[in-house]
From Swiss-Prot:
Gene3D superfamilies: Leucine Dehydrogenase, chain A, domain 1, NAD(P)-binding Rossmann-like Domain
Catalytic function, reaction form: shikimate + NADP(+) = 3-dehydroshikimate + NADPH + H(+)
Pathway: Metabolic intermediate biosynthesis; chorismate biosynthesis; chorismate from D-erythrose 4-phosphate and phosphoenolpyruvate: step 4/7
Protein family membership: Belongs to the shikimate dehydrogenase family.
Phylogenetic placement of the source organism: Bacteria, Pseudomonadati, Dictyoglomota, Dictyoglomia, Dictyoglomales
UniProt-annotated binding residues for NADP(+): 82, 129-133, 153-158, 219, 242
The protein's name: Shikimate dehydrogenase (NADP(+))
Keyword field: Amino-acid biosynthesis, Aromatic amino acid biosynthesis, NADP, Oxidoreductase
InterPro entries referenced in this protein's UniProt entry, alphabetically: Aminoacid_DH-like_N_sf (IPR046346), NAD(P)-bd_dom_sf (IPR036291), SDH_C (IPR041121), Shikimate_DH (IPR011342), Shikimate_DH-bd_N (IPR013708), Shikimate_DH_fam (IPR022893), Shikm_DH/Glu-tRNA_Rdtase (IPR006151)
Annotated S-S bridges: none
GO MF entry, a single one: shikimate 3-dehydrogenase (NADP+) activity
Length: 275
């Protein structure tokens, strides 16, 4: 029930038609009897500056930020977390001590799923993609303790740029391999897809030998089983989609908004109804 004292939260990005954040956060508010409402706030890139300046002065207590605004939001914030600074992206905004602050829970969301899976850090990781999601995944993989990380991207230079950043920030040597050589890797690896390949339900970023793969993680969550995950299943390779990462990053936003982590099971049940 909305009341005059209902606190507003929301998601900014463009477009937002695909997002399930509205449903999972509001389901969690209802489950915990929190007098709050979560809204979709679509902002076209050309109007972003004016819109965000207005939002700063409205009684909105917290925001999630998605594509294409995760980077452009930073200049409008008073402070950002260390991980946001490293990743160059913010996905959670909150008010604290009269300041508008930013954090990145994509990193923590992926790290939490790795911890749940309890994968052996003795294996190497092969990460496909070099966008914003790849950055969060790479730093989570390093935090988890994997000793060897390979990175490949359709644009080689983008992968190289990330490798240089990681070397500077973490003193860790990522091995960059050309996209066309990704399936030639000789050792057994954990494959992590951070690209959009498979979002259409038709393509797969891996047509190589599945005997080389000890685990397949595709951060796409809709469709639930991408062509990559279907192939993993057919080849008896354990696999996971990106739904838990999505839910965990949403739950971790609550830590900034309310001082406690959001209800994972409630949010996941709601998400599964929609997918």
């Amino acid at each position: 029930m909305i009341s005059p004292s209902t606190k507003l939260y929301g998601l900014i990005g463009y477009p937002l038609g695909h997002s399930i954040s509205f449903y999972i956060h509001n389901a969690a508010f209802r489950a915990l009897s929190i007098d709050a409402l979560y809204l979709n706030i679509p902002i076209e890139p050309e109007f972003f500056s004016k819109a965000i300046l207005g939002i700063k002065y409205l009684p909105i207590y917290g925001l999630n930020v998605t594509i294409p605004h995760k980077e452009s939001i930073i200049e409008f914030l008073d402070e950002i977390s260390e991980i946001s600074n490293i990743l160059g992206a913010v996905n959670t905004v909150y008010r604290e001590n009269h300041k508008w602050k930013g954090d990145n829970t994509d990193f923590g969301g992926f790290l939490k799923t790795l911890e749940d899976l309890n994968l052996s850090s003795d294996f190497s990781c092969l990460i496909l993609g070099a966008g914003g999601a790849a950055r969060a995944v790479i730093y989570a993989v390093l935090e988890y303790g994997f000793k060897e990380v390979y990175l490949t991207n359709r644009t080689y230079e983008r992968a190289e740029k990330i490798a240089v950043e990681v070397k500077k920030n973490k003193n860790f040597e990522i091995k960059v391999i050309p996209w066309e050589d990704r399936e030639k890797i000789s050792e057994k690896v954990i494959l992590i897809n951070t690209t959009s390949i498979g979002l259409d339900g038709k393509e797969t970023p891996w047509n190589g030998d599945f005997k080389k793969l000890v685990f397949v993680y595709d951060i796409i969550y809709n469709p639930k089983e991408t062509p990559l995950l279907k192939l993993a299943k057919e080849n008896n390779v354990p696999y996971k989609n990106g739904l838990d990462m999505l839910i965990y990053q949403a739950c971790l936003s609550w830590e900034k908004w309310f001082g406690f982590v959001g209800p994972f099971e409630v949010m996941k049940r709601e998400a599964e109804k929609l997918l």
